[in-house]
């Protein structure tokens, strides 16, 4: 079992609903306190029941900071209650005809008890039946940790050298069980505490 809340920023308080019904144009100053209190209780109860909760939320640009930064909406309740906070950004993935076929989703661990904070990874999501590309980024990770060797503009696999596009065109042929085990170890070194 898992609880999913989509989205925290779209929740309304009873005060906000009353204000809308009475045509009052006032700001709801109780929302962040209610969210903080709710997550204080939920974190304890869900932890005891060993039930994970996944929450989506929006971010906004912090005005006036020296460096441009993003912050979550809804106050600090979720920020302190969460075990993991991952910020997602996306860019369009285009094919050779310049048509949009999916998104490149970049993930940054802002807070984590499971992986190194600040670590970043990208994945690809196609809009068709291919869906989430489970091999995206593995060539680069494999090169970094010696699973693959780059020879010029090709990748050496065993005795042969292959273009990266050929590997990605038929990934099941090249990402064998043995290669995937090595990549799993590389991912642990890259993203786990204590490497």
Language model features by range: what are they?
Residues 2, 49, 53, 116, ...:
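Short secondary-structure junctions and interdomain/linker hinges
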Residues 16, 61-65, 151-156:
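N-terminal cationic and glycine-rich segments that engage phosphates or anionic surfaces
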Residues 13, 64, 95, 159-160:
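Short secondary-structure boundary/hinge segments and terminal tails
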Residues 150-195:
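Terminal-proximal interaction/regulatory segments of ATP-powered molecular machines
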Residues 1-37, 41, 168:
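Conserved inter-motif catalytic segment of the P-loop NTP-binding fold
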Residues 28-145:
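Phosphate-binding/switch region of NTP-binding enzymes
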Residues 21-24, 129, 161-162:
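Intrinsically disordered, low-complexity coil segments
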